[in-house]
Amino acid sequence: MRPWVPTGTPPLQGAPPNAGVMPKHQNLKANINIASLNVNGYAAPASSMSGIEKWSMIYQAMKENKIAVMAIQETHLDDDLIHSIGQCFGKRLDIINSQIPTNPRTSAGVAFVINKNLIEPKEIEKKELIEGHALVIKFKWHENDEIVLINVYAPNNRTRHPEFWEKIDTERRAKGLRRPDMMLGDFNLTEDPIDRAPAHLDDINAIEALRNLRQCLGMKDTWRHAYPNERSFTYRANVNDQNIMSRLDRIYTSDLIANLMFNWKIRQTSVPTDHWMVSTKYAPAQAPYIGKGRWTLQTTKLKNKDLMTKITSRGRQLTKDLQRWENDQRQRDMENPQTLWATFKGDLAKIAKKHCAKTRGKLVNKIRAVEKNMKSIRGNPDIDVNNVIKANEAYLANELKRLESIRTRDKKDDLRAVITNHGEVLEGVWTSINKDRKPRDLLQRLRDPNTNEEGYERDSRRMATLARNYHENLQYEGIPPPTTQRERSLDIKLELLEIPRSQIPSNSVMERTDWSTSHAQVKVALKLSKNGTATGLDGCPYKLWKELDDLHTEAVENRKEGFNILKTLTTIFADIKHHGVDKRSGFAEGWMCPIYKKKDVTDISNYRPIMLLNTDYKLLTKALALQLVEPIHQLIHPDQAGFIPKRSIFNHIRLASTIINYAEAMEEDGVIIALDQEKAYDKIRHDYLWETLETFNIPEEFTKVVKSLYKSAHTKVAINGVLSEPFQVTRGVRQGDPLSCLLFDLAIEPLACKLRNCKDLEGLKIPGIDERLIVNLFADDTTLFLSKNNHFDTVGNLLQTWCKVSGAKFNIEKTEIIPIGTEAHRLNVANTRKINSEDPTPLDNKIKIARDGDAVRSLGAWVGNKVSDLTPWETILDKMRKRLAVWAKSNPTLYGKRLIIQAVIGGYTQFLTKAQGMPPHIEAAINEIIRNFIWENDVHPRIALKHLYKPLNDSGLNLLDIQTRNEAIDLVWLRDYLNLTPSRQMWAKVTDILINAAAPPGT
């Protein structure tokens, strides 16, 4: 008689055969990966593996499979063990545990393991139904509906099952919990004979009790409904020389979300346990579509000799193509250096992708082959009665376990090698490992301006189009009605007449600069480029060009043929200079990433646009910026310090705080006005910028290249990994472009000249200083100094005229005024909202006027009258404590702690200390933070900090000494104050007046 052939549980009535299989396109939606695994205890005594080693494999399995939530059973965890695990994996994992009250380390136990990279554990609610056997969590994933999961570990004794399943529902109702979305875990029971080999039916009473619970909860075995005839098992054992297999581990889902589940997997892991992991992905109905994003070459691959050899070989072919083109000079519209370069970058990406796919591993291919063979064996109808077939399946299962263990071991070895080479070194690898990661934010919806107020767009592709259209249309916002070209040009020229002749270099001065974008300039530009920055659409990082340059240098030293990347880039840049950018090359294309700021999350205007450009584009513009270094000091007045070599933001900050003290001491009444430009870099009109460059006598050789770059500039907007169609950049200077800062400085300089030239603005007249103080700038941050006799309307009219011509716009809502001078004057300005008491109308209510004690943030520092020195420091202390707490979890050595303190404590305090000093009590608090971090909060430190401050060769640690560092900063200020050359800063001269005024008469 032929053995029974299982048919499986039939699908629900009316449901298609693959009711649980999600269409392929659904895999492109945002989804959450959920898994279940019986881990068979805390440690693995059979393999002499410690609990921490085992948990490292659990973490590795979650990381590799991008599992957000893993339900685990037979955890054998108590609070002490969870604390130990947290010390090792607390930055990445969070454990929500339920243990039995007695002997938790020896039996039962269920837990949810949360991947902090994907889910914020603070938002998870926990409810215990049965201690150590049934646990519920409830959480929200992004902005979607809440998800409720039940993790179960059923008793081994099936006679206890009816009571167990009934108690779960009773406890759920008693605790007021809604029906779960999923029930997952080790059920120690199968409902269908097909889920066992040999096939047989389990205890009918236990099955009925489980089915009654499922019916009450509205749940079904979704995987079985999707694959009614497939054999797959999660547990294997050998009993009396008989191999038995069963699908004890399952994920039940509610009927409501069954069609939203996909990518079901039952697979072996490297975790030492006798169970396999079952997992699935859930894509909520409202989840946004997720695009492929953009490709980028990982810098870790650049040390692979095989890959770099292939790229270098393709580079040598490019060199030959460029030489051939130079000799042939065929039609440019067919081929030219720029198109050859674009083809090279495209081939480079293909080479890198192919290499990564190939090196993904022979081991992975072996694993897939074993999985395929196992699936074929499980499909054999004789598996229930043929012991040889079952033995073969068991052998392959063990082989799969061995291969998975090797794969995990190899990954650990690779990571260990990376940490050995790069650990406790302040660079990308170490800092990345110890970074406090947060779940990725998804843009759920955007308000559609083409519909009513309640209209929202949820599709990522259409959201990307909405964002694209917004930024394209923004370029035309605020532009006055069109005038004739002649009138427009005349308006610009009239505005530029404010620039004094002394700021316009002569031809002879300009001829001293090399405007050719030479090989030397490109080399310097590459050297100055910072590694680790995000790439443009081509995916090529700076590190690639640097690595190719190093390989060429090595080839030259060994008298071998190499690929001269610097010469190639110089050739491409020269072609752009002479012929302009070829639009087919995509050279000037960029992509924009909107980053949420504040207010309504569905309004695209509340997102900061971050622009990312190709690195070859930025190398060209960095070389162009280097050409402006020499003449820029004549072109731009010393009042502007933004991104200009040898000019410092700290001098501007010190001047503002010194003027506040000076005005009060000398009873010079007035105001300091902090102006804010709205989207400053995005507003400058190009025709105004070109006229400005021409007025400043910038050679056409330079401006021609810049104009070509902007004429061909296009931007794509990325939303949830989806790239929009490009739009042309017709206004503004591009963020992320090394040249943009200097271009903006030149564009705003006519306004600064206009303010300095205005006779109706007294500004502040300081004895002994010929030029009155009226304006300071750091790029777009504009600070005005006005006397009590000035009128704000005068400033407003000047700004309005310049904005009309330049396209800029000042943000009244962010304008802040600090009254200075006598206390009576300061109070009067705040109460009357008038700078000049004779002003007919008060200031706009949107303008903030700072009263005594109110700190105003200016250029990264805090200034004002009678401002507490605690204003910025408490926040910084909190940030340092949190950051050091994250680092502490990596258990760094003393040497590593020294580097961390240098980076965190030094980095967080350096700017503010130099800008406005550090109070003694803050210094003491920071020393306490350092002491606690070094000695892990030990109340009796083994070595005093004063000994750790000593150099390494003097038995010290060379630890950051905050007091000494602060004294060094003070000495630098003293040095600058004592500088008596013509370059002496105005704040130092004002300080002289204050010192003289404070000195006793006759001294």
What residues fall within each predicted segment?
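Surface polyanion/phosphate-binding segment centered on an Asp-His-Pro turn
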Residues: 138-147, 181-182, 205, 243-246, ...
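N-terminal, active-site-proximal structural segment of metallo-dependent hydrolase catalytic domains
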Residues: 1-85
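Extended C-terminal regions of large enzymes
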Residues: 926, 941-1003
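Metal-dependent phosphoesterases centered on the DNase I-like endonuclease/exonuclease/phosphatase
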Residues: 57-102, 163-256, 320, 325
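Short, conserved micro-motifs composed of acidic
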Residues: 87, 226-243, 721-723, 811-854
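Basic, alpha-helical interaction scaffolds
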Residues: 306-349, 779, 840-920, 968-985
